[in-house]
Swiss-Prot record:
Gene3D superfamilies: 3.60.21.10. This is Metallophosphoesterase domain-containing protein 1. Pfam families: Metallophos. The lineage of its organism: Eukaryota, Metazoa, Chordata, Craniata, Vertebrata. Belongs to the UPF0046 family. GO terms for molecular function: hydrolase activity. SUPFAM superfamilies: Metallo-dependent phosphatases. PANTHER family: METALLOPHOSPHOESTERASE (PTHR12905), METALLOPHOSPHOESTERASE DOMAIN-CONTAINING PROTEIN 1 (PTHR12905:SF31). It comes from Mus musculus. May have metallophosphoesterase activity (in vitro).
Length: 326
């Protein structure tokens, strides 16, 4: 159902697993040590030596391993919106970073909607209510949503620190009373909201997490390295679909203006070495919109808004075989 840019044929979802897998390539000793330790039979990911400099990490792993080059990694064209869904498949419609700009979006047919965060500008209750109304107008059987760094009110620790400040960093948010944001998640009545939690729909185990590397002091920001790794360690093995707000290193995380890779190294190692989901959906980096695959996981940056906050990127459609036990 996907047409890879290096192959004139049509590539179905299950065929991605037959591509040369990144796990089969040579890994440096430091990388292997970062993921080889076991505890009670579980593979333990450790902080990568290049954690604090993702651009350097990308360069190192590319030069020494070709880790982000064909045939280990391929760009993939998503399913056309008007393509018929194969029998026995579930159609996922993936969006992210809509930033309260949902009116122009043409939503395609599908079974499950995934929104990877930044559905508001600041997480104001009025914005959340408007987003929830939009969700209610959509016909999908399931709608699964996580927060992003713009959903400030969803990060309770962030809000507790914000209202203590003497200056108004986010004036419209910092003036909110606790009773107006402490249960802001409850405003999302038309979806399944995930925050370091999982749900099973149609037989797919789906896990969602809002955290990303520090980004100018917004919501759900954490320092690179151990702090983020502790969040990724919460992701259970056996997850079919992973939703995070930010990207892993090397996958749709390039920021041309800064000439930098900004993805999380620990998230990459967690995804490729331990969790190995079939689908990883994220956003955050508006410039990275698109689809890639590494032979095990399909990576989707579903950012609807461009870097100039224009909602012109269409939703990305992914078809996956429905588990037989669903």
């Amino acid at each position: 159902m996907w047409r890879p840019r290096w192959d004139p044929g049509i590539l179905k979802a299950e065929a991605l697993a037959l591509l040369p897998c990144g796990l089969g390539m040579a890994f440096s000793q430091s990388h292997v040590m970062a993921s080889r330790r076991h505890q009670h039979g579980r593979l333990i990911i450790e902080v990568d030596e290049y954690s604090s400099n993702p651009t350097q990490a990308f360069t190192f792993y590319n030069i020494n391993q070709g880790r982000f080059q064909p045939p280990h990694v391929q760009m993939v064209d998503p399913v056309p919106h008007d393509a018929p869904k194969p029998p026995g498949y579930t159609r996922f419609v993936c969006v992210s970073d809509t930033h309260s700009r949902t009116d122009p979006i043409q939503m395609p047919y599908g079974d499950v909607l995934i929104h990877a965060g930044d559905f508001t500008e600041l997480g104001l209750p009025s914005e959340v209510k408007k987003f929830n109304e939009w969700l209610g107008s959509l016909p999908y059987e399931y709608k699964i949503v996580i927060a992003g760094n713009h959903e400030l009110t969803f990060d309770q620790e962030f809000m507790a620190d914000l209202i203590k400040q003497d200056f108004y960093y986010f004036p419209s948010v910092s003036k909110l009373k606790p009773e107006n944001y402490e249960n802001v998640q409850s405003l999302l009545t038309n979806c399944i909201y995930l925050q370091d939690s999982e749900v099973t729909v149609r037989g797919f185990r789906i896990y969602g997490s809002p955290w990303q590397p520090w980004f100018y002091g917004w919501g759900f920001n954490l320092p690179r390295g151990q702090a983020l790794l502790e969040k990724w360690n919460l992701i259970p093995e056996g997850v079919d679909i992973l939703i995070t707000h930010g990207p892993p290193l090397g996958f749709l995380d390039w920021v041309p203006k800064k000439m930098q890779r900004v993805g999380c190294v620990e998230l990459l190692n967690t995804v490729q070495r331990r969790v190995q989901p079939r689908l990883h959906v994220f956003g955050h980096i508006h410039e990275g919109y698109g689809v890639m695959a590494d032979g095990t996981t399909t990576y989707v940056n579903a950012s609807v808004c461009t870097v100039n906050y224009q909602p012109v990127n269409p939703p990305i459609v992914i078809d996956l075989p429905t588990p037989r036990n669903s």
